């Protein structure tokens, strides 16, 4: 079986594939202070609770936007699974031309999503990934990664409001029932939620116009299912897009 690891700034998502089938997945908090052994103990316990053994893993692939943790997880793969992992980065075979001023600047997760999205839909795409930052990526009909936009994520935006405005509390991110709210908490939730829906739809609309195409719009990431119902532009939510992209990249780079 294949272990895929997606390291984000807020969460680490792990998945186990048996062939093309996702057998199990987990989401844990990203903690740059954790050691290799601490992550090893955590993963061992997750496997144990799922009735899986570390010896069932035959390969590991890692995508990371947190450089300090890349080495930690590489050592984990060597120490706990007895194998060197494939790490998404320069030199990896993606099968996708990257039309970026400096291809090395593109986050690994953005390329992984683009590969998975194009593999499934085989047409031009805008991929919206709701992570610590929200990314908007355009893939053209030829399967070329053309770039995109990056905006502050929902959680970052909400925390900034709490931290920088003395009288405003920390609030949960929810889909509110009304835009004209009658208390401070609900007013913040309405502004955050519907303001973010507007941000997403405006960026996507402008990207569509600039591309001079009619790309399909898909969303992924932890908060995609929260925003998508109110969005006028998001057509589908692909919950496991990044994990699926890692599986595809592993297959393309097998020796």
From Swiss-Prot:
Co-factor: note: A monovalent cation. Ammonium or potassium.
Keyword Acyltransferase: no
Binding residues for substrate: 100, 107-110, 184
Subcellular localization(s) per the UniProt record: Cytoplasm
Biological process annotations from GO: coenzyme A biosynthetic process
Recorded GO CC terms: cytoplasm
Record-annotated disulphide pairs: none
InterPro entries xref list: ATPase_NBD (IPR043129), Type_III_PanK (IPR004619)
Family: Belongs to the type III pantothenate kinase family.
Protein purpose: Catalyzes the phosphorylation of pantothenate (Pan), the first step in CoA biosynthesis.
Listed name of the protein: Type III pantothenate kinase
Source organism of this protein record: Geobacter sulfurreducens (strain ATCC 51573 / DSM 12127 / PCA)
Recorded name of the encoding gene: coaX
């Amino acid at each position: 079986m294949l272990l895929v690891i997606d390291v984000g700034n807020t969460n680490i998502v792990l998945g186990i594939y048996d062939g093309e089938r996702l057998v199990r997945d987990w989401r844990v908090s990203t903690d740059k202070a954790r050691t290799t052994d601490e992550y090893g103990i955590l993963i061992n316990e997750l496997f144990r609770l799922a009735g899986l053994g570390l010896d069932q893993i035959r390969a590991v692939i890692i995508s990371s936007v947190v450089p300090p943790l890349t080495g930690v997880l590489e050592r984990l793969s060597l120490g706990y699974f007895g194998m060197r992992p494939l790490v998404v980065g320069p030199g990896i075979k993606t099968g996708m031309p990257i039309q970026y001023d400096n291809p090395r600047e593109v986050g690994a997760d953005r390329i992984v999503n683009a590969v998975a999205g194009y593999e499934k839909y085989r047409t031009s795409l805008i991929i919206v990934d709701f992570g610590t930052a929200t990314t908007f990526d355009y893939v053209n009909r030829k399967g070329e990664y053309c770039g995109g936009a990056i905006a502050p994520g929902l959680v970052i935006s909400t925390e900034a409001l709490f931290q920088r405005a003395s009288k405003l509390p920390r609030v949960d991110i929810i889909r509110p029932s009304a835009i004209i709210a009658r208390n401070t908490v609900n007013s913040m939730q309405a502004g955050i939620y519907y303001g973010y829906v507007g941000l997403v739809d405006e960026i996507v609309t402008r990207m569509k116009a600039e591309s001079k195409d009619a790309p399909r719009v898909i969303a992924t990431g932890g908060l995609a299912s929260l925003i998508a119902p109110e969005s006028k532009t998001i057509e589908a939510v692909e919950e496991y897009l990044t994990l699926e992209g890692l599986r595809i990249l592993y297959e393309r780079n097998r020796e």
